């Protein structure tokens, strides 16, 4: 998967709609994962 940003408000590269942002970039979708769901990962 491709890390594009953070799912935490106020964090660097905050992404309000992780799934939508990933789709906009051409990925199949995305989800908030990793430790404590802080990162936005796009499905590659």
Curated annotation (Swiss-Prot):
<keyword id="KW-0391">Immunity</keyword>
<keyword id="KW-0929">Antimicrobial</keyword>
<dbReference type="GO" id="GO:0031640">
    <property type="term" value="P:killing of cells of another organism"/>
</dbReference>
<feature type="disulfide bond">
    <location>
        <begin position="22"/>
        <end position="42"/>
    </location>
</feature>
<keyword id="KW-0399">Innate immunity</keyword>
<feature type="disulfide bond">
    <location>
        <begin position="7"/>
        <end position="32"/>
    </location>
</feature>
<keyword id="KW-0964">Secreted</keyword>
<protein>
    <recommendedName>
        <fullName>Defensin heliomicin</fullName>
    </recommendedName>
</protein>
<keyword id="KW-1015">Disulfide bond</keyword>
<dbReference type="InterPro" id="IPR036574">
    <property type="entry name" value="Scorpion_toxin-like_sf"/>
</dbReference>
<dbReference type="GO" id="GO:0005576">
    <property type="term" value="C:extracellular region"/>
</dbReference>
<dbReference type="InterPro" id="IPR001542">
    <property type="entry name" value="Defensin_invertebrate/fungal"/>
</dbReference>
<dbReference type="GO" id="GO:0050832">
    <property type="term" value="P:defense response to fungus"/>
</dbReference>
<comment type="function">
    <text>This peptide has potent anti-fungal activity. Has no activity against Gram-negative and Gram-positive bacteria.</text>
</comment>
<feature type="disulfide bond">
    <location>
        <begin position="18"/>
        <end position="40"/>
    </location>
</feature>
<dbReference type="GO" id="GO:0045087">
    <property type="term" value="P:innate immune response"/>
</dbReference>
<keyword id="KW-0295">Fungicide</keyword>
<keyword id="KW-0211">Defensin</keyword>
<comment type="similarity">
    <text>Belongs to the invertebrate defensin family. Type 2 subfamily.</text>
</comment>
């Amino acid at each position: 998967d491709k890390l594009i940003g953070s799912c935490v408000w106020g964090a660097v590269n905050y992404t309000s709609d992780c799934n939508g942002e990933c789709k906009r970039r051409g990925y199949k979708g995305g989800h908030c994962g990793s430790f404590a769901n802080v990162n936005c990962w796009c499905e590659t």
